[in-house]
Amino acid sequence: MTTTFTLPDFKSIVLCSFATALLSYSLTACSDTVQQREAEHYILPANYVGAFYVIFDQASGEPLQYQADARQYRIPTNGVLLTQARISEGVIAADKLRFFRQDTPEQLTEITARWLTSIDTAQAYQDNTTYIFGGGPGVYSNSELKCDIHFRGFHIGTKSQILDEVNHFDIESFIQQNKLC
């Protein structure tokens, strides 16, 4: 007995084989353990409001500091910390990502409220709670200078301060003005 395949049958077999191989690869890739980031503590000046950033891999930056197994990022009054540290990649548990205000040299106040949306409502303008908004990694790239700068950025303030962009500034302008790239 001879089995013959027509061209449409052959294409179906190849397509199914490709789909099976792709699915197998995807499942294998997704089954790897997810890289966990180190704990991070961001310490801001007492009354700081606005955008703040950590720019990584800066030779003239601050060396990485640790406190109780957590990376310490002390944000200066201009809102931008330059650090020699490499960016920590991976996922981080919410309880390992903490934000503080330095009220006195000995006293930190933790900011626990996170605002996850920027919906502009009348209620937002009535809320006087201090929030951390946004956050996440970014990369500034300059192809002419062959330069990539990794950073993390956030905002701190009441909802109205965040919506009104109080002390908001563009990190790209900061990088260019300070010739970091």
Question: Predicted segments — roles?
Answer:
Residues 28-29:
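C-terminal motif of bacterial Sec signal peptides marking the signal peptidase cleavage site
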Residues 34-181:
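Protease-labile, long low-complexity intrinsically disordered regions enriched in Pro/Ser/Thr
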Residues 2-17:
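Bacterial N-terminal signal peptides that target proteins for export
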Residues 6-10, 23, 32:
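Short intrinsically disordered, low-complexity segments
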